[in-house]
């Protein structure tokens, strides 16, 4: 049981600590920014604390927007809270998180301290190595929008002693949102984007986790995406309707299109990883999107030092995810190496073409600041510097040769254009015609539309 009282949770110190942790980027419907709230911070903290303890606090309606889903063409609806509401939710989250962490199942990996996607993937691999070869791969249909408020509050009622805390959480659950000028009531679900929502969603689905544990079932869950593993097909087929029946008690159901029973030798995708037999590799579509992101870094207007920061950040990200899945010197590993060379080479070419950096020596010094050791062996890194510069200079010289040829052609074209102009007599004898000058040319227009242009 969580025993701290509301007045122990909400004090000036917890408000100060939580304020430092909330995002300063977005504003809510009241349009009060982080910096504006900060201008009179002491008073705002005191007013917030008093409104909570007196029970007069009411959250602002949320601002509903849509953002791109990672690695997808789909949109995700999220709701933006005001700075004050985010602050209050952060205090609640910081207070409740540690208690609920002790109650959660260890096979739940999303939104938790010391848990991660990689750990979920490794746990899945462990179960497969234990010869649990039959997999029920599924997720919950429209999960975040389907959480039953009454049932969630009943769960909280059994865990939290001070009912004022539950009442406060209930306010956040019930607060609706505006999308443009339309108001949407919020009678079920948690707001995606709210600070409390990940914790509340885990609290709700922990009931399923405990049910699976009681049934002695192996599973790995990451939010609403999960796999259940069995030693034989019969057990998998038998258990599926049992799971569906249990989920009905939570007003949830499996998403039919994403639910299948398969043998590991036929493969399945979970958390962006393709499991086939005892092997695993990154889903190709996801990898290609990551490679495209890498190439886009070289196409930005960043200077070379800014490019180095961005490419190092990218390399750090793939080290913490992709390289923990992909085998060294596998096809996917070699693909990442190849595209890194192409990306950096293109940036060297653009920088050389812009005459910002002129010598190979300068480029080598800059290249040494890139974390090549994440993808390459130390012994081969110097060779990669040479390869990158060689490719870039080859492209630069080819492009320069093309431009020189184009200049010669343009010069000859202009010679003849001027000759024709000198031999031409311009007659303007029609109503609606006008004569003007534009870009070193006489331009004849008829009612504003260009009819003829002659260089001079």
Region locations from a protein language model:
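Conserved polymerase palm-domain catalytic core
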Residues: 51-52, 61, 65, 106-107, ...
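Short, mixed-charge aromatic SLiMs
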Residues: 110-121, 229-233, 338-349
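Short, residue-level hotspots on alpha-helical faces of the histone-fold
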Residues: 86, 90, 94, 98, ...
């Amino acid at each position: 049981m969580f025993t701290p009282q509301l007045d122990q949770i909400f004090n000036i110190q917890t408000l100060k600590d939580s304020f430092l942790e909330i995002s300063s980027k977005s504003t809510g419907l009241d349009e009060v920014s982080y910096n504006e709230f900060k201008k009179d911070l002491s008073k705002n903290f005191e007013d917030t604390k008093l409104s909570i303890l007196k029970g007069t606090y009411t959250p602002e309606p949320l601002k509903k927007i849509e953002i791109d889903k990672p690695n997808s063409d789909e949109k995700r609806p999220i709701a933006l809270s005001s700075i004050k509401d985010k602050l209050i939710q952060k205090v609640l989250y910081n207070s409740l998180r540690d208690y609920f962490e002790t109650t959660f199942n260890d096979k739940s990996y999303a939104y938790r301290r010391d848990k991660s996607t990689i750990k979920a993937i490794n746990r899945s691999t462990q179960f497969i190595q234990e010869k649990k070869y039959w997999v029920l791969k599924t997720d919950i249909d429209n999960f975040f929008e389907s959480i039953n408020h009454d049932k969630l509050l009943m769960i909280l009622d059994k865990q939290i002693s001070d009912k004022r805390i539950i009442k406060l959480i209930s306010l956040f659950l019930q607060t609706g949102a505006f999308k443009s000028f339309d108001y949407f009531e919020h009678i079920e679900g948690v707001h995606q984007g709210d600070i409390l929502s990940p914790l509340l969603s885990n609290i709700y689905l922990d009931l399923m986790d405990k049910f699976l544990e009681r049934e002695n079932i192996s599973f790995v869950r990451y939010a609403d995406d999960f796999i259940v593993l069995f030693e034989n097909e019969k057990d998998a087929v038998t258990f599926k309707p049992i799971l569906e029946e249990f989920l009905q008690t939570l007003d949830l159901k499996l998403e039919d299109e994403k639910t299948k029973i398969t043998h590991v030798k036929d493969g399945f995708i979970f958390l962006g990883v393709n499991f086939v037999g005892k092997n695993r590799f990154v889903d190709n579509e996801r990898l290609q999107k990551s490679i495209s992101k890498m190439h886009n870094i070289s196409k930005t207007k960043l200077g070379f030092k800014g490019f180095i920061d961005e490419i190092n950040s990218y390399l750090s990200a793939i080290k913490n995810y992709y390289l923990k899945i992909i085998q060294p010197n596998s096809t996917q590993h070699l693909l990442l190496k190849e595209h890194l060379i192409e990306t950096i080479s293109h940036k060297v070419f653009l920088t050389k073409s812009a005459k910002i950096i002129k010598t190979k020596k300068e480029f080598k010094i800059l290249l040494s600041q890139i974390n090549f050791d994440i993808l390459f062996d130390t012994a081969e890194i110097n060779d990669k510097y040479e390869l990158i510069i060689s490719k870039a200079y080859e492209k630069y010289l080819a492009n320069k040769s093309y431009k020189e040829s184009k200049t010669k052609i343009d010069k000859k074209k202009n010679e003849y254009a001027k000759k024709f102009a000198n031999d031409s007599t311009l007659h303007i004898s029609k109503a609606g015609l006008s004569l003007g000058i534009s870009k070193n040319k006489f331009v004849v227009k008829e009612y504003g539309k260009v009819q003829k242009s002659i260089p001079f």
